[in-house]
Amino acid sequence: ASGGGVALIRIADKKAMFYAKPGGNPHSAEVLPDGNVVVASSTGNLLSVYVYNGADSYVSRPAFTMPVHSAHNVVWDRKRGCLWTATGAQLLKLAYNGKRTAPELTQVRSYDMAAGNTDAHDLAPVCGEDAMYVSTNQHVYKFDCAAEKFLDVQIFQQNTIKSISTGPEGYSTIVMRPTSGGSNWWSAEVCDMKGNRLFNRCLLYTSDAADE
């Protein structure tokens, strides 16, 4: 969040299970297999790994940090046992050492997107597929994790898509973008992949390249 904080909330009882203040405009967080939490901070240009033992919800400082320019996203890949993050016009594959009290991340490989892409923003697993959606300021891709290829996506708008979320069969894939006439980090609607509005006047925060 723009205030610099991050929290993990248990939906069942709304309890804050974990919270910290990495600063640098945190945009995304992911729980690692050992329970530790990794946070992507955009203006901080880094990933922060926090040791979480389940006893104390507040963790004052990260155990490990890794520079990643304009870090906006992190996704754990259970099948491959790796962490993904997209930055600029690249998708990075990271290895996690699995040491809960001494965590480390290292880059294994990078995958380049097409020329002209800038400011990667969202990275989201595609429900039921071995793939992830990746959005930049100019384009939306589906990355096939097995084939290691970026695929074009049929969507009502390619540029400035800030968030994509999928669900099981019967649920729409939902998309968020900054809405015209307002602040460029807010959206007043949620759409499907064809641009049909599913919710209106919801005033949801989407973030934007300007706040990176």
Q: What spans do the regions from the language model cover?
A:
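Conserved small/polar residues in nucleotide/adenosyl-binding loops
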Residues: 205-212
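Conserved blade-ending motifs and adjacent loop-strand segments that build the rim/top face
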Residues: 152-168
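Conserved beta-strand positions in repeat-built beta-propeller and related beta-rich domains
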Residues: 1-3, 39-43, 83-89, 132-137, ...
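Short coil/turn segments that connect the beta-strands within blades of beta-propeller domains
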Residues: 34-36, 79-81, 129-130
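Beta-rich catalytic cores
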Residues: 25, 70, 119
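Short loop/turn segments immediately following beta-strands, especially the blade-tip
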Residues: 52-56, 95-102, 145-150
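A short beta-strand motif characteristic of beta-propeller blades
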Residues: 15-20, 59-65, 107-113, 151-154
